[in-house]
Each structure stands twice: as structure tokens, then as C-alpha cells.
Amino acid sequence: MIKVLECEMSVIGALLCSDNDEALQTAFSRISPKAFSDESLQEIYKAIVKVWQETGKTDCVLILKALPEEYRARIPICMDLVPAPSLLPHYTAMLMDQQR
């Protein structure tokens, strides 16, 4: 379970750090909130998608404002798991593999 949670958190972290529009579009087209087993990560993912759809960016300040207080502490933890935003396609593929 820890590896699953770490993978899910890495996807969130990579989404938050990435500025690659193509990688973000691909990830958003492949991932649904149900791909996350953790409810807080589902809600964070929904907030990321909403902000991205409204602004074209994954702006952390706007995402934090869109989230209930209890989920906000997860954001920096997720971001710390990601050594490079360019790994978003890799983390997306890992998350999709877990769904099989």
C-alpha cells in the first residue's frame, strides 16, 4: 500500500511542478479522480484539474485556495517526492499500470 500511495502522491507532485502543457494535457486525459485510492488525493487532483481548466496553469496558490484546510498540508509533501517535473509521463504510466 505504501508504494501505491507514494506513486499517487508523486503524480500529484509532478502535476503541481510541471509547466509542460503537453504532458499535463496527456496526464489529465488519462487520469480520473478514481485512479487515486486516497480520498484526499482525489480531492487535490480535482482541484488541480479545475484550476488548470480555468487558468491553463497548475498554480499552487489557486489550488491551495480551492482546497479545504485539511488537504493543504499534503501539497508540499507530494511536491517533495518529485525530483523533476519532467517525470510526469513516467508517474502517469505507473499510476495507470496500478489500475490494471
Say what each PLM segment does:
Residues M1-Q98:
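Noncatalytic partner-interaction/assembly domains of nucleic-acid and motor enzyme complexes
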